């Protein structure tokens, strides 16, 4: 199994295997692994933003990525909230589990798609979603552009 497949499968799994793995690595390996993960997350974010733009081009507002969307996580009970924000110290003596089911298939498909995608042929700069109402620099640029409108 490729190291990136192993890493991404642990990262996307809903357990603490990723943290157990990370706790056993040295700093240089950890930073390298984080860089690999962020490259794939940037690719996924790029796909999501392009998909959102396609939906908006046909008049559908995809709420999850729109500027007006306020809710990041839906909590059905307080236990979900507690699990998300409870920062329990990492135990390194546990076993790392690797899901070789659908999650592993997803990771392999993601890696293949990134490799064969036209998006991946050019170097992907880190993709970030900018909310123009909250980004001061972007808002200032937009104000300058609006004030320089040429009237006919």
From Swiss-Prot:
Induction: Expressed in the late phase of the viral replicative cycle. One of its GO terms (cellular component) is host cell cytoplasm. Keywords: Host cytoplasm, Late protein, Virion. The keyword Ribosomal protein does not apply. Belongs to the orthopoxvirus OPG100 family. It holds the Pfam family Pox_J1. The keyword Transport does not apply. It comes from Monkeypox virus. The gene is OPG100. This is Virion assembly protein OPG100.
